[in-house]
Amino acid sequence: TYMYSGMADVAALTGDTAYIHAIDRIWDNIVSKKLYLTGGIGSRASNEGFGANYELPNATAYCETCASIGNVYVNHRLFLFHGDGKYYDVLERSLYNGVLAGISLKGDAFFYPNPLESAGGYERKPWFGCACCPSNLCRFLPSVPGYVYATRDDSLYVNLFMEGTSDLNIGKNK
């Protein structure tokens, strides 16, 4: 998902239609065939990635917390590029069900993978040998307010429903 975020950035910066069509096809494939109901992505632990189309097991779902963060990034970039709310529909599911599920309410324990089913033996842990998720969550969570609003030309978008205030420039108006 991080590579796809970069690809979306390149598409937006260059206007290269090959990149635009490619990232749109990738997004369509992910959303229609590889996305869990929760917004989690990545069914395989072996490659920390996608499996075949419709390979979405519950008990062995990988749905890494970092992948959910990356899914927020790519959907935000595609929303900014296309201006279509469908990207925020996916972003919101990934944020609330994939990212926030990855950290305990106290902020001291984490899920690396987020399986959808457990026989009771799965719990958040304080640390991992590969501790990308805790540090990634620490970096990502303070950025959430930046996803609430967006402006484009003379339009204001309220993308996430949460308490807050903001001063925004919309067209020539503040």
Q: What are the language-model segments listed below?
A:
Residues T1-K174:
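Glycan-recognition and catalytic cores of secretory/periplasmic carbohydrate-active enzymes
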